[in-house]
């Protein structure tokens, strides 16, 4: 069983668990900012919701404050009629709540308008516009991380907020996900100094692009480090977080000195994102949370015919449960449509309070838990940094194979953790099974460690045609053959076969490995079959390695075919057999295997919805009960107690022949089975 990670960050304490994030992104068209957020108005509505901490509006992407900033060069929205920051500070202090500021970092439109020389420049020397903006008249609005913006405006304004309002922390938005390579003179000079290359590459086809992209990443990380160090030096105890930094899309050693890790989840269809974030963030060694949007729309942000609507409470509970099971905190984002004067909406605050009670009920059973290692999915930082798919530091990352591996394994009810090389290398022997999903560019150190892991008794699943070159035919027990391009073959599973597409497919022949199944040109199981196996399993030392020579997990993430998930389960069964903990449950149940002290806890999260399958409807409402669930756990001695921690369900258990068998008839949203 794994040891608890030592935290390298800071937080306000265990009881600060559920938060409210409120922001407006104040702009030039506002007219009544701060008019309706007096302490008298705020306090009853905050009590109704009962958050443990609050993040309030400060400076959004337009670069305008919703308070009277006195920092030279600051841009105060012309719509400020009363100082909202002062009112929120008084209200939260009287309620005993920490107050953080929502502060947009790299993305600052007002600073770009005043100081074009501070902004990111494209390869042509022109403005780059907003994130993902490629057409129309592009303006300066994103700051260069090497430019004077940080020292001239951002840090002075943060220090002003600390000194004038005694704020307790900063949640810096518009940072990682707003950054892309900059071609200003500062960056060009630094690039040439670091590399000796005169001209930075203009596009992704240039052989130096990966190096240039990583130069940008390192420049950004240095910028965040500078503001963290400056704030901590000015007033120790003020907490700092950069939105999405050190999360699933930014793997590697979390050495940047932020105090906690956070990111705001997608407003709709965000459940899958949280499934990965929770399993990765719990390996970072820092306090972490995910911010859930309390509202959504069905057809994209900003479309008039798809206005924002409040999420059902149960939708937020379901999204939260995925995070809570892995020991994370949760905050919710509120921005009532049409209200710019600072008002909170009573019926909405009541709803978020209901969600908060659901969350706080789970603190005792979730907080401070650690994983029971079962399946580790490798999310190599070396692979990601060698394969950027775009200019953006967050969105230009190829995470698809890792997502596909996690989702397919969860549907087979394995306990899954996501670890980068930094986290996995020192803990490799803890995990009975490791899956390396098309991580073609993992480090040589990782390859050798995985080979040694197998020789020592571990079980490894690798996928992708390039894995043959990385691990070698002798280790995999196969001989490499033709490399097919844009190929679809059918692989047998269950009572049939599933089509699997791969950009490249290596047709291998077993040598020492045992081939399983045959590739088919059609769904037929007894005709038009190739001699090449669907997958292979090789014994190496005391362990085993399974090899699927195609982009299996990329395909699953794109198509989510149940038969393909069944094929993944077949491969895992041949490779790993029966593990110490096995769960049988409906496919919509996610499992989290955790421990607290000597207690073992099996978390069950219901991802199902009672709403019909409609592509235009992202809501989760009327969540149906699901079951039955059966858990089998190898235990030499009978437990003293087996009980449900959260919901009142029909539970029974027995212990015989060294196996504990637990049966739960049904559960609703989130249940935790506690074994003592």
Annotate the PLM regions.
Residues 101, 105-165, 200-213, 225:
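Active-site-adjacent "subsite" loops/lids of carbohydrate-active enzymes
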Residues 2-64, 95-97:
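N-terminal structural segment of carbohydrate-active enzymes
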Residues 24-37, 139-153, 303-313:
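Active-site mouth loops of central-metabolism enzymes
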Residues 23-25, 55-64, 103-110, 171-182, ...:
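Short, solvent-exposed turn/loop segments enriched in Gly/Ser/Thr/Pro and often Arg
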Residues 2-15, 45, 99-100, 164, ...:
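Carbohydrate-binding surfaces of carbohydrate-active enzymes
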Residues 47-83, 107-126, 179-187, 249-260, ...:
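Aromatic-lined carbohydrate-binding/catalytic grooves of carbohydrate-active enzymes
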Residues 17-19, 50-58, 83-134, 171, ...:
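Glycine-rich, aromatic-flanked loop segments that form ligand/cofactor-binding clefts
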Residues 30-49, 70-95, 152, 222, ...:
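Aromatic- and glycine-enriched glycan-recognition loops and surfaces
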């Amino acid at each position: 069983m794994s040891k608890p990670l030592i935290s390298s960050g800071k937080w306000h304490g265990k009881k600060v668990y559920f938060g409210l994030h409120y922001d407006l992104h104040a702009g030039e068209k506002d007219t009544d900012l701060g008019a309706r957020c007096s302490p008298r108005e705020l306090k009853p509505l905050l009590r109704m919701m009962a958050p443990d901490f609050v993040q309030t509006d400060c400076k959004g992407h337009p670069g305008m404050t919703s308070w009277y900033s006195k920092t030279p060069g600051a841009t105060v929205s012309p719509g400020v009629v009363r100082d909202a920051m002062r009112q929120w500070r008084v209200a939260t202090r009287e309620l005993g709540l920490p107050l953080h500021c929502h502060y947009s970092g790299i993305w600052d439109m007002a600073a770009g308008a005043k100081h074009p020389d501070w902004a990111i420049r494209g390869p042509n020397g022109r403005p780059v516009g907003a994130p993902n903006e490629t057409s129309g008249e592009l303006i300066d609005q994103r700051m260069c991380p090497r430019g004077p913006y940080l020292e001239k405006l951002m840090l002075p304004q943060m220090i002003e907020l600390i000194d004038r309002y005694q704020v307790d922390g900063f949640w810096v938005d518009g940072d990682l996900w707003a950054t892309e390579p900059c071609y200003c003179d500062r960056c060009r000079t630094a690039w040439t100094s670091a590399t000796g290359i005169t001209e930075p590459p203009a596009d992704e086809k240039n052989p130096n692009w990966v190096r240039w992209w990583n130069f940008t990443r390192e420049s950004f990380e240095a910028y965040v480090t500078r503001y963290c160090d400056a704030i901590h030096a000015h007033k120790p105890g003020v907490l700092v977080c950069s939105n999405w930094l050190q999360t699933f899309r930014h793997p590697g050693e979390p050495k940047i000195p932020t105090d906690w890790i956070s990111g705001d989840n997608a407003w709709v269809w965000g459940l899958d994102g949280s499934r990965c974030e929770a399993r990765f963030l719990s390996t970072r060694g820092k306090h972490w949370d995910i911010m859930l949007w309390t509202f959504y729309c069905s057809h994209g942000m900003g479309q008039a015919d798809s206005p924002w609507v409040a999420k059902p409470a149960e939708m937020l509970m379901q999204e939260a449960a995925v995070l809570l099971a892995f020991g994370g905190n949760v905050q919710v984002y509120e921005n009532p449509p049409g209200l710019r004067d600072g008002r909170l909406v009573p019926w909405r605050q009541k709803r978020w309070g209901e969600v908060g009670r659901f969350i706080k009920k789970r603190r005792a059973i979730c907080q401070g838990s650690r994983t029971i290692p079962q399946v580790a999915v490798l999310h190599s930082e070396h692979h990601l940094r060698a394969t950027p798919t775009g200019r953006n530091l967050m969105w230009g990352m190829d995470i698809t194979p890792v997502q596909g591996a996690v989702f397919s394994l969860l549907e087979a009810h394995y306990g899954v953790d996501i670890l980068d090389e930094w986290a996995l290398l020192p803990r490799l022997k803890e995990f009975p099974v490791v899956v390396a999903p098309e991580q073609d560019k993992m480090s040589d150190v990782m390859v050798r460690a995985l080979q040694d892991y197998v020789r020592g008794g571990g079980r490894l699943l690798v996928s992708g045609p390039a894995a043959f070159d990385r691990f070698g035919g002798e280790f995999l027990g196969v001989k490499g053959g033709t490399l097919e391009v844009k190929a679809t073959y059918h692989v047998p599973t269950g009572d049939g076969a599933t089509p699997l597409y791969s950009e490249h497919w290596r047709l291998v022949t077993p040598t020492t490995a045992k081939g399983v199944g045959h590739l088919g040109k059609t769904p037929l199981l007894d005709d038009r079959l190739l001699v090449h196996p669907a997958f292979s399993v090789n014994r190496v030392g005391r362990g085993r390695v399974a090899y699927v020579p195609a982009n299996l997990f990329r395909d699953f993430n794109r198509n989510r075919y149940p038969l393909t998930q069944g094929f993944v389960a077949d491969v895992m069964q041949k490779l790993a057999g029966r593990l110490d903990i096995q769960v049988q449950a409906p496919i919509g149940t996610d499992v989290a295997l955790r421990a607290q002290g000597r207690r073992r806890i099996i978390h069950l999260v219901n991802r199902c919805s009672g709403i019909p399958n409609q592509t235009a409807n992202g809501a989760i409402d009327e969540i149906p009960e699901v079951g039955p669930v059966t858990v089998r756990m190898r235990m030499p001695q009978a437990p003293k107690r087996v009980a449900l921690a959260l919901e009142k369900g029909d539970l029974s258990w027995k212990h015989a022949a060294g196996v504990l068998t637990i049966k739960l008839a049904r559960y609703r949203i989130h249940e935790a089975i506690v074994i003592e």
